[in-house]
C-alpha cells in the first residue's frame, strides 16, 4: 500500500491549480505529466503542496503513534483517519467542476502520475521475482514466484526508492479472493 499516494503525488510534483500549465515553464518544462504532456511549474511551490505538507506530516506522526503502546492507540488511529479524509477530499476537490479553487488538469495529472507509479511498482515487483496478483489505485497484491526471492520488506523499499513514494506492507495472506 502506498502511503497517502495522491497527497504525496501533489507534494512531489507540485500539483496545484496555479502551477498547472504555467506560462513561466511553458517552453522549457522540467516536470511533464506522463501520458498527458501537461507541464507543471518548477519556479514556485503551489498552494496545495504548501497546505498539504503539514497535514500529511501530522497524519504520519499520528499513524506512527497509533501503532505505539506508549500512546492511546485508539485515539491516534481516529485522528490519523480524520486527516486521511481531509487529504482525500483535497484530491477530490481538484476534479470538482464547480470548485472555486480546482482545476481538472490537476485531477487528471494526479491520476496519471498514480498510473505511472503503479506500473513502475509492477515492473519492480516482476524484476524481483514476484508476480502481481492485483493492483488498484494505491495498492498492490503480490506473491513470490519461487523460494529465495528478496523479502517483502526489501521489495517495498525498492519500490519506494524507484517511485519516490513510500510503500508500506499492510498484511500477508495465505489466500485471497478478488471479486
Residue ranges and their predicted role:
Residues 2-179:
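Conserved acidic
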